[in-house]
Amino acid sequence: KSYPINIKKICGEIEGLTLESIPLKSKGLRGIAVLSKDKSDDDIILLNSNRDACEQNFDCGHELYHVAFHRYAGNTFNCLENVKPCQNKFLEWQANEGSAELLVPYKLLLPEIKKSYCTLKSYQGIQNFIYKMSKKFNVTDSVISIRLDDLKYEIFQYVNGASLNDVKVLSDKRQKDDGIYCISLIDMREFYRKKEEKKHKFHYYNSCKADINIYRS
């Protein structure tokens, strides 16, 4: 499948699925999936039309995952900005991961990272890469940032010589259980940001000292 993909368009072509975008007024509500109890009725996905096209595309993937894989767990799923105590955190995490993998597959993202790896040695370099990938896959910057963080172990393997087919995809819990600890590109972005901020402050301090010395002389 060519990328970027329009999940809303795909959902609109699925028989037995009704998709609508409406202005949802509840705070933080991004979408709703209503699963039919009877095969004669359509499943329904409602998206918040107050959100932009990229956000709705991701939300649609999230709700579609509920429709496809979580029928056993209930009839209605609300996609909220922050998961509430009454929601199943694991199912919401699964739906987010499913939408992210559908829109930004790791087998397409990892080669892009390796190709640009030499430019990812500064805060701005990583920021530029995130922006470039968000345009390539038609997602928000935050989706790419989360992918870079979640796929840190997979990225480590690939840039160090593993083939795409040999890359092991492990959850954070499995990595911790196996004693695997990797630094993500998002961790490095924060490191570079602080380093560059400190460097800027140092130069500013020296500049101020020079101005004071000139004034005294």
Q: Each PLM stretch: what is its role?
A:
Residues 1-217:
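Active-site hotspot residues in diverse enzymes, especially metal/ion-binding acidic/histidine motifs
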